[in-house]
Amino acid sequence: SSLDQNELTGIGSGEPLARISQCNAGLIKRDLRRQGKAAEKLRALSSEQLLDICKRAGDLFLHAELPLNGDGDSQTADQYISTLSQTSGLPHVLVRRNMQKIFTVFDGMHGILNGLMRGMDAGVVETGFGEHSGIPVHYSPTTNALGVVLPSNSPGVNSIWMPAIALGVPVVLKPGREEPWTPLRIMQAFIAAGCPAEAFSF
């Protein structure tokens, strides 16, 4: 754990709920130097494997008890809903709706990639070359990682970075101060479904 920590408390009760370690610039620079290897590990999986991982991760995100930290603690779906509601002030019903939106992205990743890639075969992500409407095309990621700064007031916004994993691009996530729960749960669902842990910096 870091010396620089953020204590999360319940909005109504003021009760301490979690203590979150904060990264310093040195740790971030160190992690960024490792992103090339993280990208290699993620891109070693085929497009089909990555899409299968997304399907499995969606079910895990919605229903499973997932790791919470490196100390063996875990969190059920109901605990996630309750904790997020307490730290963000969102009602349980809105948290559940956002969970369903995120599940829809996991479950519908093939269609999302189809839209992002304008109908090109997803296999072009792993080979780098393909054909679209009779025209040769080339796919080459312009970065080894996608950096994402997230808010505290909308769990559903996490769905915008999820396709990066299916495209073989690791993510560096800076969660909102009161809402580390959703990106952490998505990340743990991906890992439990078979995605390399190196694909995530959090």
Please report, for each region that a protein language model flagged, where it lies by residue.
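N-terminal Rossmann-like NAD(P)+-binding subdomain of aldehyde/semialdehyde dehydrogenases
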Residues: S1-E131
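Rossmann-like NAD(P) dinucleotide-binding subdomain of oxidoreductase/dehydrogenase enzymes
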Residues: R118-F202
